[in-house]
A protein has these predicted regions:
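Flexible "cap/lid" loop of the alpha/beta hydrolase fold
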Residues: 86-87, 92-122
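Gly/Ala-rich beta-loop-alpha elbow adjacent to hydrolase catalytic centers
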Residues: 73-77, 81
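Post-His helix in hydrolase/transferase enzymes
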Residues: 225-237
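Serine-hydrolase catalytic-loop signature spanning alpha/beta hydrolases and amidase-signature enzymes
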Residues: 4-14, 25
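The conserved beta1-alpha1 loop
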Residues: 2-4, 190
Length: 243
């Protein structure tokens, strides 16, 4: 399980029990997040980019002697597992992409420009809460907003700036991912109210032969939190069918 920016492995708390009944489960805290925060300065001095952070994940698999995995990601975590497909496709059995970020629309591009212009001057929690509200504006998205805000509070401003800097590197990478199918079984699980990212995923799935899409009713961006039963059943059935 690969979480998004500002989160931690704890965002999968509604998945762990269900998935452990079927699979061996590995939860990873990305550099600077969760329990990886304490060792950050000692081990993660290389540049922040999607390739290096994805290599962190592969290093964990190597350490645990895991040759192949089914990967489940949420939000920015989906970009990382898609990057792993490029770096080490033989390590990937299938992908479950929740709240996937596959292309930026005009609104999200404006947010990226605004955030990068102000990230060193405005307290990062102001920015984080603003972005969370824009991406997840509805009342039923409140649990997701609160969960991510509580996790983001554990980051320091310096760490937030490093991660936000990744947004500048997203466009060419996402363009490449859109133009190149992985040829691996890929399931996208998207909330029907994920207005910033769902249209782009719908277009991508039409062009990628091995991709499929499940749209979760009454649900926003963080579908594993807002509709966990739907997410769990759909993902488990998909992974089982490709095991």
């Amino acid at each position: 399980f690969i979480h998004g920016a500002g989160g931690s492995s704890s965002i999968w708390y509604k998945q762990v029990k269900e998935f452990k009944a079927h699979f061996n489960v590995l939860l990873i805290d990305l550099r600077g997040h969760g329990k990886s925060q304490e060792i950050f300065e000692r081990y993660f001095s290389n540049e922040y980019n999607f390739e290096n952070i994805s290599l962190d994940v592969i290093e964990v698999l190597d350490h645990l002697k895991i040759k192949q995995s089914h990967f489940v990601g949420i939000s920015l975590g989906t970009i990382l597992i898609r990057t792993i497909c490029e770096l080490a496709p033989d390590r990937v059995k299938s992908l479950v992409m929740g709240g996937a970020v596959t292309r930026l629309n005009i609104r999200s591009k404006m947010l990226v420009v605004l955030g990068n212009a102000t990230k060193k001057f405005i307290p990062y929690m102001w920015l984080y809460k603003l972005f969370a509200w824009i991406i997840m504006p509805r009342k039923r998205n409140q649990e997701s907003r609160i969960l991510f805000a509580n996790q983001a509070k554990k980051l320091c401003q310096k760490e937030f700036v490093r991660w936000f800097g990744l947004t500048y590197k997203m466009n060419p990478l996402l363009r490449y991912f859109n133009e190149n199918d992985t040829q691996l079984p890929t399931l996208y699980i998207m909330g029907d109210e994920d207005y910033m990212f769902l249209p782009q995923v719908m277009q991508l799935v039409r062009n990628h032969a091995n991709s499929s899409l499940q749209i979760v009713p009454d649900c926003g961006h963080v579908c594993n939190v807002e509709q966990p039963d739907y997410f769990n059943n759909t993902a488990i059935n998909f992974i089982t069918s490709h095991s």
